[in-house]
């Protein structure tokens, strides 16, 4: 057996091979383990011959013992193997590895040493915070002494780096070997691997970055240090470059506070090592794919090697193992693995796929199978043990079987268990439903409240693993209010309200709720009976001392009255609660715990069910949509347990229903912790379902504002608990809400549920709840006259002018009627006393406020996210705090996309922020609305384009607001004021339903001058003038009539889009002109420059004529400020004029001055286009609805004209112009899909590279029709690869047969896979849009489909090359044919060899490969060199394979036939 090469031989080796690797395991030790151990010895500087003796094994164990607790898996395996070999040498009989390790540790007292070392903390040699004993720093005589690393440790580190070649194993090896090391020791480990300079350079860069970050965050104190005080370590000190060993020891053990510099430095090095490992292992696990003939075992080895190098959490790696390992397998293995079911083990996958591989692998496998078969024949089948005696299932006797029984056949009911009838004839109902359970076998499991209180909205963490199984027969009694105090915490002063909150128990009702209680120290099994008033115990189960006082009592029951003894003040322990109460002792058939004990324990009978009085709202999916079918992503153990408990309770309350695999839909579910970090919240990712669900209209368009509430004497705020879960969901829609809770480690199938109520996160829940609650409240309002109810979602504001008693009565009526409808209002969410928290506001009897605003100080780091939050707080505060500005603060965020990007405050923003800090420090209050008083809105200008306004009644502020929106680039204050007043009026109509009287800071004359011409820009109500310091005024105005006697300036400008060059100028009626050349400009900028030139060169009064609507729109609005510097200069020039008349004329209409100036500025810049074919293009578009690119090419129209024709067509403006693109795909790849329209099936095939489509209407979506369409496609176009979804028609045998016959590779798409059928899905949408545009022109859908296909293929141009899909496809096929032909010609050239001479060297060299042949020279390639040789020095011959040696020039000249053949080929090559 090869024992000569191992540490054991003979009988010792036989004993070794009988020892099991694990307790009760099947695998045993083999000789290969000994060979492996011998090789591993070198890593630790030990000789393999030490394994041959007991003393040698003892030395190995002494070396490995300190490293074993923190070592890698390989090190632990070596330690275990040495223990087994030691036991064999010592003739200690052991059965498995675990027993051998225990034997060795007991023999050498290793366990006692560790235990004693743990007890003696003062004598420990390990620094604080560690567990390993392998430390270079030891405590000797209460002083810390450094011991250098041993050569064995350094040798092991070097061998690891050399053997693993910076694999993923290097990082854990470094962690194990450097445990407890100082920075000096870590640098020593890095120095011994000095040959790897590239890796060390990366490590150095990471260490330098971390050291710099340390210095930035740990700045040394200012000034000199006191005498004897230890300085704080810097980044270079931690790295060991500027610190000594003694300083490192002092910082680690004696400093106050202590700084473990060694551990900190190890973290930096580990970060660098991870970066090095990632660089040396560039192949990602996502790129690992199994080859077509690669054995599955080799693929798994490569996959796990790449997985170890991934720097990802373990849960992510688990997910990669579960999904990517199967997803990236080849088709043969993938087909086998899918047949294994959900989440197979790796061992099952390896066994199932062991036959997949190339011929060599299959031959090797066949040899192994044949050898195993021969061994089985030699060994023979194993015999089974003796069979037991036969037993009859009819009479129960031994010796014969049921079919041989002579006794009459007994019929047994499987429902009640009785003999004589069958289950279908049973009249007894459920079997043993009221049977008294034996006391010893019905103990209910303990379930604590702190672990039990899970709900959809929150659950405690962690959940209890000993949960009780649920029942399908009846929902259990659930107690979920409050929390249970610990044993002995209850006091006599506990109030009834406090006692009612302690719930800790859940019992299923599929059997009697029996519970073990302790009465005066005696355990008693009793029935928890919520229908019994008293607690009655049988005399045989409970005995009290004779001297304990009692009194006689008669209690009534179903069978009549019974005499009992009543003992008072008896102590009863139920779960973790101790209750004192009365106990009755008598002849009761069963022990009963009544309500007198259960009520003190805080138990309730909760039946959470959906209300049957609320009608379901019918909901459906969008047309053509289907429900979500998404895979559940991996979850951690604690999340799975939390979700299990949440769903179990919701199922018991009727909010969820358990379903199976028959429901094909699924949505991912996950859990997050609430803010208090003690409870869990379940979240379902309904994004895909929301896309497919019909659209809803939000019936409540906004949040009610407290300024719109009227002042009332009595106010109560209540909240509807579990609002959504009380409203039933449409039964037909429930199947789409299905989700799955996976099992840990995939130990079983997931638990699937679907919602019976409105789920959170679904887009229909808010609308349905709002509408349902509104209908319920309408009925409630009729029963509560004088009570005003304001509702937003589940928050209710109840107010009245009644006295307190009557108001509370009406509130109780509201709560009672809501409860009748299934809407519960918990007591803890009822607010009866001020201040009332409502919708983020604080309501008081006479005022309302918001919570105190605390703005963070300016010092410190500011990111985009932090500033966004501050701006949100300021916007919220601006409804009550006047004067808040955020313009400059928001300006800092422009162009910033990364939320964590740091922001540097500008001076303006900093001043603005400090001003806001001063504003929010003062408390502001708002009043309530009085409908009898006048509503006034006052506006103030704050400067810098920011405005503020207040709504008041008789001087009391209702609310405030601000306005800083600039809608146009060029604007003036009057236009902004008009928009602001419009906003104020909309806000007043929304909150109070009436218009206010608006007070504006503008002069009446100024406003009228502007308003008479521009009244159409907006509508505003009546307003009045208010004298404030910042009055709005017009800085200039334009006259309406031409100024007589003044010169007229015709202005124009032109620019080229290509060169960005332009001209601007003017020409006056009196012959004055000026032309100016411009660079890097546009048409609009040139037009504005011309106006500016005319204003500069004219007098105080001027007439200006332009043909630019852009210029007219800007200047006629009289802007006073602009973001454009050029417009700002024009405004300044206008202010200097006394009168300006501005007129517009159409261009190119032969108008005198306009035509002349247009020719002057257009010369050399642009061409005047004469658009004669516009009408022809319009007619063609009305017929085919082609896109603008097609009209540009066919009719020679400018882009802007062609786009205008498309924009004017109402049928082309549904979703705008689609943008065409091209995906990366081969030329013979097609995608196919079926879509539905008007109740018919349209099958569509798209050529991925060109976008060309084939489509037709088919009778049925079957495999036969799909295969027939595929044959048509194959007859017309080359198809080598077909990609579809995994629908039944595409995966049918008919399609598979056509693919086999046509040699077509067929693949199917997977959700979230890059190879999904995205192209054909996009074409489906485009085809439907074209059909909708031409549907009125066709009688039948079949005709419309063919017409739409023609339009798409031939009339829509764009994408690659700017041509149509049909042109692109033909072009690609032609190009492919040309390339194939050219490749054949190139191949002919490559079949020739060239012998050549260089310079004056007479020796012929070669042969070289011919690349190109011209008239005067040839291009050849010899080895890696490419050379150009004159024709006179080159001889070309045809390569016929092996030939005789040619040693003369004549032999080469003799092959003139080949040269002639090359002449023709070279001509073709020259043309190319």
Swiss-Prot record:
The keyword Signal does not apply. The p66 RT is structured in five subdomains: finger, palm, thumb, connection and RNase H. Within the palm subdomain, the 'primer grip' region is thought to be involved in the positioning of the primer terminus for accommodating the incoming nucleotide. The RNase H domain stabilizes the association of RT with primer-template. GO terms for molecular function: aspartic-type endopeptidase activity; DNA binding; DNA-directed DNA polymerase activity; exoribonuclease H activity; RNA stem-loop binding; RNA-directed DNA polymerase activity; RNA-DNA hybrid ribonuclease activity; structural molecule activity. Specific enzymatic cleavages by the viral protease yield mature proteins. The protease is released by autocatalytic cleavage. The polyprotein is cleaved during and after budding, this process is termed maturation. Proteolytic cleavage of p66 RT removes the RNase H domain to yield the p51 RT subunit. The lineage of its organism: Viruses, Riboviria, Pararnavirae, Artverviricota, Revtraviricetes. Its cofactor is Mg(2+). The keyword Lipoprotein applies. Residues 1043-1166 form the RNase H type-1 domain. A motif (Tryptophan repeat motif) lies at residues 1007-1023. The viral protease is inhibited by many synthetic protease inhibitors (PIs), such as amprenavir, atazanavir, indinavir, loprinavir, nelfinavir, ritonavir and saquinavir. RT can be inhibited either by nucleoside RT inhibitors (NRTIs) or by non nucleoside RT inhibitors (NNRTIs). NRTIs act as chain terminators, whereas NNRTIs inhibit DNA polymerization by binding a small hydrophobic pocket near the RT active site and inducing an allosteric change in this region. A motif (Nuclear export signal) lies at residues 16-22. A zinc finger (Integrase-type) spans 1172-1213. This is Gag-Pol polyprotein. Residues 483-499, 1454-1463 have a biased composition (Basic and acidic residues).
């Amino acid at each position: 057996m090869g024992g000569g090469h191992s540490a054991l031989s003979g009988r010792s080796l036989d004993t070794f091979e009988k020892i099991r690797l694990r307790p009760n395991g099947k695998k045993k030790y083999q000789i290969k383990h000994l060979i492996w151990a011998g090789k591993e010895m070198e890593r630790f500087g030990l000789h393999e011959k030490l394994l041959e003796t007991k003393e040698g094994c003892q030395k190995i164990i002494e070396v490995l013992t300190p490293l074993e607790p923190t070592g890698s898996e390989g090190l632990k395996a070596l330690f275990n193997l040495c223990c087994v070999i030691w036991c064999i040498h010592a003739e200690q009989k052991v059965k498995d590895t675990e027993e051998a390790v225990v034997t060795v540790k007991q023999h050498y007292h290793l366990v006692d040493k560790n235990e004693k070392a743990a007890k003696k903390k003062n004598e420990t040699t390990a620094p604080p915070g560690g567990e390993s004993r392998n430390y270079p720093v030891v405590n000797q005589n209460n002083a810390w002494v450094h011991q250098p690393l041993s050569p064995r440790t350094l040798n092991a580190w070097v061998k690891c780096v050399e053997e693993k070649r910076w694999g993923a194993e290097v990082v854990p090896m470094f962690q194990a070997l450097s445990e407890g090391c100082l920075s000096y020791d870590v640098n020593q480990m890095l120095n011994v691997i000095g040959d790897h300079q590239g890796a060390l350079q990366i490590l150095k860069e990471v260490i330098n970055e971390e050291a710099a970050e340390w210095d930035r965050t740990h700045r040394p104190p200012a000034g000199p240090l006191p005498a004897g005080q230890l300085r704080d370590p810097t980044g270079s000190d931690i790295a060991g470059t500027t610190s000594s060993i003694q300083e490192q020891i002092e910082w680690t053990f004696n400093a106050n506070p202590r700084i473990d510099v060694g551990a900190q430095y190890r973290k930096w090095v580990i970060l660098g090592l991870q970066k090095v490992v990632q660089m040396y292992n560039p192949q990602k696990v996502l790129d690992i794919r199994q080859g077509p003939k690669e054995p599955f075992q080799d693929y798994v080895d490569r996959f796990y090697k790449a997985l170890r190098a991934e720097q990802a959490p373990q849960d992510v790696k688990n997910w990669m193992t579960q999904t990517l390992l199967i997803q990236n397998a080849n088709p043969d293995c993938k087909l086998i693995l899918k047949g294994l079911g959900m989440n197979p083990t790796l061992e099952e996958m390896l066994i199932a796929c062991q036959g997949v591989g190339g011929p060599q692998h299959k031959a090797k496998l066949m040899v192994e199978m044949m050898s195993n078969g021969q061994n089985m024949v030699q060994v023979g089948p194993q015999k089974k043990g003796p069979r037991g005696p036969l037993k009859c299932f009819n009479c129960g006797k031994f010796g014969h079987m049921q079919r041989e029984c002579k006794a009459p056949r007994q019929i047994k009911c499987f429902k009640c268990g009785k003999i004589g009838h069958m289950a279908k004839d049973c009249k007894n109902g459920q079997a043993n439903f009221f049977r008294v359970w034996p006391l010893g076998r019905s103990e209910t499991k303990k379930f604590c409240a702190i672990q039990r209180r899970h709900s959809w909205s929150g659950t405690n963490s962690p959940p209890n693993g000993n949960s009780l199984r649920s029942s399908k027969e009846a929902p259990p009694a659930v107690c979920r209010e409050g929390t249970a105090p610990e044993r002995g915490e209850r006091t006599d002063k506990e109030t009834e309200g406090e006692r009612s909150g302690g719930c800790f128990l859940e019992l299923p009702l599929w059997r009697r709720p029996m519970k073990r209680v302790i009465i005066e120290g005696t355990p008693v099994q009793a029935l928890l009976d919520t229908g019994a008033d008293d607690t009655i115990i049988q005399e045989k189960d409970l005995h009290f001392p004779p001297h304990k006082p009692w009194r006689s009592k008669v209690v009534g029951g179903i069978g009549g009255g019974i005499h009992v003894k009543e003992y008072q003040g008896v102590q009863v322990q139920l779960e973790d609660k101790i209750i004192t109460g009365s106990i009755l002792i008598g002849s009761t058939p069963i022990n009963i715990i009544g309500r007198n004990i259960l009520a003190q324990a805080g138990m309730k009978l909760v039946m959470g069910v959906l209300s049957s009085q609320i009608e379901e709202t019918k909901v459906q999916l969008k047309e053509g949509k289907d429900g979500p079918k998404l895979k559940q992503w991996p979850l951690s153990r604690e999340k799975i347990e939390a979700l299990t408990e949440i769903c179990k309770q919701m199922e018991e309350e009727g909010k969820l229903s358990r379903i199976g695999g028959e429901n094909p839909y699924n949505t991912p579910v996950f859990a997050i912790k609430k803010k208090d970090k003690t409870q869990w919240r379940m979240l379902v990712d309904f994004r895909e379902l929301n896309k497919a669900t019909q659209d809803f209209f939000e019936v409540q368009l906004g949040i009610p504002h407290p300024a719109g509430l009227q002042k009332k004497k009595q106010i109560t705020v209540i909240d509807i608990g579990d609002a959504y879960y009380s409203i039933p969901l449409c039964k037909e829609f429930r199947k789409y809400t299905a989700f799955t809770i996976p099992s840990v480690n995939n130990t079983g199938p997931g638990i699937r549920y679907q919602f019976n109520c409105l789920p959170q996160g679904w887009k229909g829940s808010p609308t349905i709840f709002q509408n349902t609650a509104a209908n319920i409240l309408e009925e409630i309002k009729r029963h509560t006259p004088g009570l005003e109810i304001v509702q937003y979602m589940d928050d209710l504001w109840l107010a009245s002018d009644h006295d307190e008693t009557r108001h509370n009565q009406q509130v109780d009526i509201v709560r009672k009627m809501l409860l009748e409808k299934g809407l519960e209002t918990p007591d803890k969410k009822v607010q009866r006393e001020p201040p009332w928290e409502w919708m983020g506001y604080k309501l008081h009897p006479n005022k309302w406020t918001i919570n105190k605003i605390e703005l963070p100080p300016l010092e410190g780091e500011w990111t985009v996210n932090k500033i966004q939050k501050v701006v949100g707080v300021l916007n919220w505060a601006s409804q009550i705090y006047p004067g808040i500005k955020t313009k400059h603060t928001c300006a800092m965020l422009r162009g910033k996309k990364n939320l964590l990007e740091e922001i540097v405050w500008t001076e303006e923003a900093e001043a603005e922020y400090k001003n806001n800090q001063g504003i929010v420090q003062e408390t502001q209050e708002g009043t309530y609305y009085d409908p009898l008083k006048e509503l006034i809105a006052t506006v103030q200008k704050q400067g810098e384009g920011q405005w503020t306004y207040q709504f008041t009644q008789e001087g009391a502020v209702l609310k405030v607001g601000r306005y800083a929106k600039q809608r146009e680039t060029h604007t003036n204050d009057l236009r902004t004021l008009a928009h602001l007043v419009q906003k104020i009026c909309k806000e007043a109509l929304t909150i109070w339903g009436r218009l206010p009287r608006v007070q504006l800071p503008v002069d009446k004359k100024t406003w009228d001058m502007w308003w008479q011409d521009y009244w159409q820009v907006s509508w505003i109500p009546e307003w009045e003038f208010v004298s404030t310091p910042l009055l709005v005024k017009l800085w200039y105005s334009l006259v309406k009539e031409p100024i007589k006697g003044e010169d007229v300036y015709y202005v124009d400008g032109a620019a080229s889009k290509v060169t960005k060059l332009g001209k601007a100028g003017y020409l006056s009626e009196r012959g004055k002109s000026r032309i100016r050349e411009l660079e890097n400009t546009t048409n609009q900028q040139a037009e504005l420059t011309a106006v500016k030139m005319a204003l500069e060169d004219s007098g105080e009064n001027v007439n200006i004529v332009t043909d630019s609507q852009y210029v007219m729109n800007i200047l006629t609005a009289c802007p006073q400020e602009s973001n454009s510097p050029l417009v700002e200069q024009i405004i300044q020039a206008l202010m200097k004029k006394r009168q300006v008349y501005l007129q517009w004329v159409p261009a190119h209409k032969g108008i005198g001055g306009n035509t002349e100036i247009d020719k002057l500025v257009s010369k050399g810049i642009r061409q005047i286009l004469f658009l004669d074919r516009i009408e022809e293009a319009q007619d063609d578009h009305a017929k085919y609805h082609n896109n603008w690119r097609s009209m540009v090419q066919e009719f020679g129209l400018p882009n802007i004209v062609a786009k205008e024709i498309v924009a004017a067509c109402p049928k082309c403006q549904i979703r705008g112009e689609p943008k065409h693109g091209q995906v990366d795909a081969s030329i013979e790849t097609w995608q196919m899909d079926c879509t539905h329209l008007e109740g018919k099936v349209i099958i569509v095939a798209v050529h991925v590279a060109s976008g060309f489509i084939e489509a037709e209407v088919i009778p049925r979506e079957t495999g036969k029709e799909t295969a027939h369409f595929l044959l048509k496609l194959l007859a017309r176009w080359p198809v080598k690869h077909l990609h579809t979804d995994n629908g039944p028609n595409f995966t049918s045998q008919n399609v598979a047969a056509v693919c086999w016959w046509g040699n077509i590779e067929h693949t199917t798409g997977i959700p979230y896979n890059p190879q999904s059928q995205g192209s054909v899905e996009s074409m489906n949408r485009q085809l439907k849009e074209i059909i909708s545009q031409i549907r009125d022109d066709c009688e039948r859908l079949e005709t419309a489909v063919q017409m739409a296909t023609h339009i798409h293929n031939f009339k829509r141009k764009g994408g690659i090359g700017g041509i149509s899909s049909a042109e692109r496809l033909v072009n690609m096929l032609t190009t492919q044919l040309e390339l194939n032909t050219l490749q054949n010609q190139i191949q002919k050239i490559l079949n020739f060899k060239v012998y050549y001479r260089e310079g004056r060297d007479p020796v012929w060299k070669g042969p070289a490969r011919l690349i190109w042949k011209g008239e005067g020279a040839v291009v050849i390639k010899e080895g890696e060199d490419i050379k150009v040789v004159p024709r006179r020095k080159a001889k070309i011959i045809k390569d016929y394979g092996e030939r005789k040696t040619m040693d003369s020039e004549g032999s080469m000249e003799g092959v003139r036939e080949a040269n002639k053949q090359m002449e023709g080929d070279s001509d073709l090559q020259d043309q190319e």
